[in-house]
A protein has these predicted regions:
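Cytosolic-side transmembrane helix boundary signature
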Residues: 1-4
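Intrinsically disordered, polar/acidic, low-complexity terminal segments
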Residues: 6-9, 13-212
Length: 213
């Protein structure tokens, strides 16, 4: 084979395979979480199991593609009524399979960010941050109040990490996440979190929490 052929394989087919394998691995972990929820609900003789929909990580190109078919007709297969909820825009399996940074950063009153995960989803894909809250912030904040989150790095850089106050409940845990470029958990010094008034833009609560690894 020519040098050009080898170069094409390296630049296209190998990265494509790595991305596809990574996506399959993520889906497998999500399946384990869903089935654990279902098994527990059946063991407890519940009428319904609430499971998150799949989050499908992107692959390099349209084909091969992951089978995104997901129907509540699966209830017949599992023998229990299934309610499938939105998964968010992050790989929630990370929050069940990897050690978090425990931070206990206050948003307001009795609402806290308990912990967070920072991960690079796949080669060439943005870094993601997942936050776990002790409760759904939306239940404690009125329509005129939003929350803010930012990181401060050891060299003084401020990185915006805002997420919506409406979080995703997965197996009794309140999670939210977003993509953030250029963030490294080893370089983080503190997290600033709190609330602000959407009418005036003024901060109504601000808290700084040191990040200790």
């Amino acid at each position: 084979l020519s040098v050009t052929t080898y170069a094409m394989a390296f630049l296209y087919f190998i990265p494509s395979y790595i991305l596809y394998y990574s996506s399959i691995k993520s889906i497998s972990k999500q399946t384990e979480i869903r089935e654990e929820i279902i098994d527990r609900a059946k063991h407890n003789k519940q009428d319904q199991a609430i499971i998150p929909d799949y989050y499908f990580p992107p692959v390099l190109h349209a084909g091969p593609s992951l089978d995104t078919f997901n129907s509540e007709a699966m209830s017949r297969y599992y023998g229990i009524d299934l309610k499938i909820t939105a998964p968010g825009f992050f790989d929630y399996s990370r929050a069940f399979n990897f050690k978090p940074l425990n931070i206990n950063a206050k948003i307001c009153n009795n609402v806290y960010i308990k912990s967070l995960w920072i991960y690079k989803q796949q080669m060439g894909i943005k870094t993601f941050v997942i936050f776990e809250f002790n409760k759904n912030p939306a239940d404690s904040l009125d329509e005129n109040t939003a929350m803010f989150i930012s990181f401060k790095t050891k060299d003084g850089k401020i990185i915006n990490a805002d997420v919506d106050k409406k979080t995703f409940q997965i197996d009794g845990r309140w999670l939210s996440g977003r993509a953030i470029n250029g963030i490294d958990s080893n370089e983080l010094e503190s997290i600033t979190s709190g609330t602000w008034d959407v009418r005036t833009g003024a901060r109504t609560n601000e808290n700084i929490t040191e990040i200790i690894k």
